[in-house]
Swiss-Prot record:
Residues reported in the UniProt entry to bind substrate: R12
Listed name of the protein: Hydroxymethylglutaryl-CoA lyase
Enzyme class: lyase
Regions crossing the membrane: none
Organism: Pseudomonas mevalonii
Length: 301
């Protein structure tokens, strides 16, 4: 049975796009619950300005309160050397950096060009290598940009390759606005797999147009075996009106297990976490599988 790695991004990418910020204690509790389901890769926070992203305030406290010997890799997003040093002080052993495949998105999101963004986080890669801290890379807008429209697959592959050559062990290709279709996804990953090992690629799909699970299936067919997901489908994109969150972890697990892949994650346990966090945030549970499991559980009890 082939294994697929599920990378849970709800506590960071999910929560930072929800209107209601959670306390440090609530975020630590959520992460602990997710780890208890068998998830072994969890994005726990971001060392960014609380002025711009108040939902991630106190990420240093969150990281410090997480166990260091439970077999789970807790990752934090860092935009620059300053953020990296803060993550390092908090005991973080894996960080993530992000770039965009679209010049327009890069300028609107982080106020610099793609080349300038690489100048910002190249020192992070250098310092992380010296400290034996792993670095994951994100590429935004791989299947479309909210400002400039279509994005050439060649532009995505170029950015992904640069991240890989700088030392990122894994490159997550993100459909930030959730507009991609399976045919485009297949073409993109086929092209990128010519530039760097497919084992170093991950899929990160938003569900704005209902294509996230279909895109996961298309990426699986191209040999991709790592996918980002968010419990209860938490999240969105502030630059894309109406954008939904990431593909729900529950929906991803339902697909993967049904296709015969092993994940080491308990689907029903994740669904229970999804119900609880949705209620806590006062938001709708966006996971189809999660809602179906909750309805079945209600009937049985």
């Amino acid at each position: 049975m082939q294994a697929v790695k599920v990378f849970e991004v709800g506590p960071r990418d999910g929560l930072q796009n929800e209107r209601q910020p959670l306390s440090v204690a609530a975020r630590v509790g959520l992460i602990g619950e997710l780890a208890g389901t068998g998830l072994r890769h969890i994005e726990a926070g971001a060392f960014v300005s609380p002025r711009w992203v108040p939902q991630m305030a106190g990420s240093d406290e969150v990281l410090r309160q997480l166990p260091s010997n439970d077999g789970v890799s807790y990752t934090a997003l860092v935009p620059n050397r300053q953020g990296f040093e803060a993550a390092q002080r908090a005991g973080c052993r894996e960080v993530a950096v992000f770039a965009a495949a679209s010049e327009a998105f890069s300028r609107n999101n982080i106020n610099c060009s793609i080349d300038e963004s690489f100048e910002r986080f190249t020192p992070v890669l250098r310092a992380a290598n010296e400290a034996s801290i792993r670095v994951r890379g994100y590429v935004s807008c791989v299947l479309g940009c909210p400002f400039s429209g279509a994005v050439a697959p060649e532009a995505v592959a170029k950015v992904a390759r640069r991240l890989y050559e700088l030392g990122c062990y894994e490159i997550s290709l993100g459909d930030t606005i959730g507009a991609g279709r399976p045919d485009e996804t297949a073409q993109l990953f086929e092209l990128c797999a010519r530039q760097l090992p497919v084992a170093a690629l991950a899929g990160h799909f938003h569900d704005t147009w209902g294509m996230a699970i279909a895109n996961v299936h298309a990426a699986l067919a191209q040999g991709v075996r790592t996918f980002d997901s968010s419990v209860a489908g938490l999240g969105g994109c502030p630059y894309s009106p109406g954008a939904s969150g990431n593909v729900a972890t529950e929906d991803l697990l339902y697909l993967l297990h049904g296709l015969g892949y092993s994940t080491g994650v308990d689907l029903e346990a994740v669904a229970q976490v999804g119900v609880r966090i949705s209620a806590q945030l006062g938001t709708a549970n966006r996971s189809r599988a999660g809602l179906a499991l909750a309805a079945r559980s209600a009937r049985e009890h």
